[in-house]
């Protein structure tokens, strides 16, 4: 017997086709194109550094705003009015032979001249800081360029700005390594590997020294007010040292921008609970159990000082970081913990003697 026919089934939605994977067309490179191929570098940063890096970048990098332009315009108009009024007073004093008023006008002219000179000097320092950012962008373009003729002049300008003498061994090795057949990317890359590490090593030593001083001072100091003053002073000194090493001089306005970040660093130095929690993640449970509250605060303040120095070092360098040569907090962390343990052991052994 034949089976009965099944009733028809009506579906409310149309039949969906199964998605098929789309394959891209094969792409082949010729031998000439493969020689000029350069892989793009991926900048991998830890997630926990995002907020802090943005805060330091905003504090160090000069920026323009509408309010600043309005204030500058008002100051310029006020200055022009003062100069015009001073000229009128001088003419009246000369005509009436009022020598006292004429002397006052001369003193005012000297004060105004000193103020104008300070403004020009401050503008020049801010302009130099902006130029360093432009030089870093230019270096990044040269490191991805295959042109010839710009790399050597650019590197010689950087060496002159940094105060590196022509007879310096690192610069002599760079001159011996370059030749006419190399392009700009190779020349700048050789400079980054042979000459730039000389300045970077000095900056690393300064960061290590200042971070160690902050760690030890806070670990042994019983007064919170002394800790805050010491952190503020050493952080500003560290910024000045790093900028001097890379040939940049900060002005008064730039230091005001940095002071905001220094206050943030001071706040971390006084937050003992937060520092202890962060220290538990960074150190083993055994070591954290042996350290006192002051020692944990010292390590936290030292690491924050090192972070500030690393960011200032990054913004003052004329070249971008390449080949993962950027200093890490872990490089300074082990050194700080070792120095702190050694200091605590010495302090425990001295009363026994």
From Swiss-Prot:
<dbReference type="InterPro" id="IPR006507">
    <property type="entry name" value="UPF0283"/>
</dbReference>
<feature type="transmembrane region" description="Helical">
    <location>
        <begin position="213"/>
        <end position="233"/>
    </location>
</feature>
<protein>
    <recommendedName>
        <fullName>UPF0283 membrane protein YcjF</fullName>
    </recommendedName>
</protein>
<comment type="similarity">
    <text>Belongs to the UPF0283 family.</text>
</comment>
<feature type="transmembrane region" description="Helical">
    <location>
        <begin position="100"/>
        <end position="120"/>
    </location>
</feature>
<keyword id="KW-1003">Cell membrane</keyword>
<keyword id="KW-0812">Transmembrane</keyword>
<feature type="transmembrane region" description="Helical">
    <location>
        <begin position="70"/>
        <end position="90"/>
    </location>
</feature>
<dbReference type="GO" id="GO:0005886">
    <property type="term" value="C:plasma membrane"/>
</dbReference>
<dbReference type="InterPro" id="IPR021147">
    <property type="entry name" value="DUF697"/>
</dbReference>
<dbReference type="Pfam" id="PF05128">
    <property type="entry name" value="DUF697"/>
</dbReference>
<keyword id="KW-0472">Membrane</keyword>
<feature type="compositionally biased region" description="Basic and acidic residues">
    <location>
        <begin position="1"/>
        <end position="19"/>
    </location>
</feature>
<keyword id="KW-0997">Cell inner membrane</keyword>
<feature type="region of interest" description="Disordered">
    <location>
        <begin position="1"/>
        <end position="35"/>
    </location>
</feature>
<keyword id="KW-1133">Transmembrane helix</keyword>
